[in-house]
Amino acid sequence: METVISFTAIAVAIMIGLAALGTGIGFAILGGKFLEASARQPELAPALQTKMFIVAGLLDAISMIAVGVALFFVFANPFLGQLAG
């Protein structure tokens, strides 16, 4: 049982870490491309900014889903029920 708990803790750490890494890389690429596009065509900056914030919200949602799944595994681990039963 301790093995399942330790592997779950490692999996949760990997999930949260990769979600944070992916979100950080995504925001960096998104911000860089937004600044590049705004520098090329400044008149499109307001429209691009709206689209950038929508995509930023989707990027942030992906990491929040990963945190939710990780918290599910921490507090309501479904694998422990299979060991007990």
Swiss-Prot record:
It holds the Pfam family ATP-synt_C. It is a multi-pass membrane protein. One of its GO terms (cellular component) is proton-transporting two-sector ATPase complex, proton-transporting domain. One of its GO terms (molecular function) is lipid binding. The chain crosses the membrane at residues 10-30, 53-73. Its main location: membrane. It comes from the Bacteria. Keywords: ATP synthesis, Cell inner membrane, Cell membrane, CF(0), Hydrogen ion transport, Ion transport, Lipid-binding, Membrane, Transmembrane, Transmembrane helix, Transport. The record marks D60 as: Reversibly protonated during proton transport. It is found in: Cell inner membrane. F(1)F(0) ATP synthase produces ATP from ADP in the presence of a proton or sodium gradient. F-type ATPases consist of two structural domains, F(1) containing the extramembraneous catalytic core and F(0) containing the membrane proton channel, linked together by a central stalk and a peripheral stalk. During catalysis, ATP synthesis in the catalytic domain of F(1) is coupled via a rotary mechanism of the central stalk subunits to proton translocation. Belongs to the ATPase C chain family. F-type ATPases have 2 components, F(1) - the catalytic core - and F(0) - the membrane proton channel. F(1) has five subunits: alpha(3), beta(3), gamma(1), delta(1), epsilon(1). F(0) has three main subunits: a(1), b(2) and c(10-14). The alpha and beta chains form an alternating ring which encloses part of the gamma chain. F(1) is attached to F(0) by a central stalk formed by the gamma and epsilon chains, while a peripheral stalk is formed by the delta and b chains. This is ATP synthase subunit c. The gene is atpE.
